[in-house]
């Protein structure tokens, strides 16, 4: 199946949106009147063009001047979780919004230096219009680059997420359907093994079923990146599972793949109860929501790389810590 028209529509949308002082006009040209936009805290859900322009895109472009969109991954496909007869296609984009951090943004003090805001976006296309967007972004990464990291030391390494090994993530041309099917099968197998953390297998053995030994896990600020199954188990997956109980089943809005790339997002993806230890925080009886985007690169029949976006500010706010409000006092 060919998704070239939908890809071109999103590329045209980006070209219009990324121009200075053209936010509402660009949004109105490409978004359907009844669109839904989802973004991380403090933006959450937006369904009004003027609000989306004035609260999200105008402030971003005011704060990050000379803005450039630097994409590392770009692909499209049908949502595997819905009936193919719904007529919609999803386009996925991941990379960084790069600019000069010249004005404050959400209380983050500017540096007047180059900065890169990691983002990932799922866009649903129906009838030549964008009807739904999930725009997830690593706002704590912007804080860290500005010397205002609000988190305690993290278990993984802090860095700007790179694109995929081999730099082949921009799928601007059509790809064989069987490659996307193989990628989706690998992702589904990983999700099935993950389950509710009750596989009964030792963690590293469980991971080795669907991951290459030299896997790369590009985690968000607050958790960090890890390399190899052994270090991923020790530096993220093991500590994370130990810090939570009563994990709900996975709940995705969209899951798709094209070529060697695929991914999913939820709102939320799952809930779990924090028993203590995550990011050095004490436990609580609250069931926490996790809003997540995961993108993957497949090699052979296993997964090789994973880019993860988690709404860390929303997770902490559910535990009584408003990071943005606290930032204003520092």
Describe the role of every protein-language-model region.
Residues 1-330:
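C-terminal and inter-domain tail/linker signature
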């Amino acid at each position: 199946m060919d998704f070239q028209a939908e890809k071109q529509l999103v590329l045209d949308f980006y070209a219009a949106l990324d121009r200075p002082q053209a936010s509402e006009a660009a949004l109105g040209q490409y978004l359907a009147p009844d669109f839904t936009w989802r973004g991380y805290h403090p933006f959450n859900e937006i369904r009004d063009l003027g609000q989306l322009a004035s609260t999200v895109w105008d402030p971003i472009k005011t704060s990050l001047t000379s803005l450039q969109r630097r994409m590392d991954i770009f692909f499209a496909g049908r949502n595997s979780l819905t009936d193919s007869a719904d007529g919609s296609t999803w386009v996925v984009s991941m990379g960084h919004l790069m600019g000069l951090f010249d004005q404050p943004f959400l209380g983050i003090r500017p540096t007047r230096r180059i900065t890169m805001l990691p983002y990932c976006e799922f866009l649903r296309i129906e009838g030549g219009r964008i009807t739904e967007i999930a725009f997830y972004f690593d706002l704590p990464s912007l804080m860290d680059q500005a010397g205002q990291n609000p988190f305690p030391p993290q278990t993984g390494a802090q860095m700007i997420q790179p694109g995929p090994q081999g730099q082949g993530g921009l799928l601007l041309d059509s790809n064989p359907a069987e490659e996307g099917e193989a990628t989706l099968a690998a992702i589904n197998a990983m999700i099935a093994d993950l389950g509710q953390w009750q596989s009964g297998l030792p963690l590293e053995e469980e991971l080795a079923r669907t991951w290459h030994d030299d896997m790369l896990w590009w985690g968000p600020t607050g958790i960090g990146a890890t390399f190899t199954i052994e270090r991923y188990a020790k530096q993220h997956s093991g500590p994370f599972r130990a810090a939570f109980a009563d994990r709900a089943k996975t709940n995705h809005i969209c899951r798709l793949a094209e070529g060697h790339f695929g991914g999913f997002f939820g709102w939320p993806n799952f809930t779990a109860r924090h028993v203590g230890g995550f990011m050095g925080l004490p436990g609580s009886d609250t069931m926490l929501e996790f809003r997540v985007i995961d993108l993957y690169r497949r090699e052979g029949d296993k997964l090789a790389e994973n880019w993860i976006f988690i709404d860390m500010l929303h997770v902490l706010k559910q535990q009584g810590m408003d990071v943005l409000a606290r930032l204003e006092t520092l």
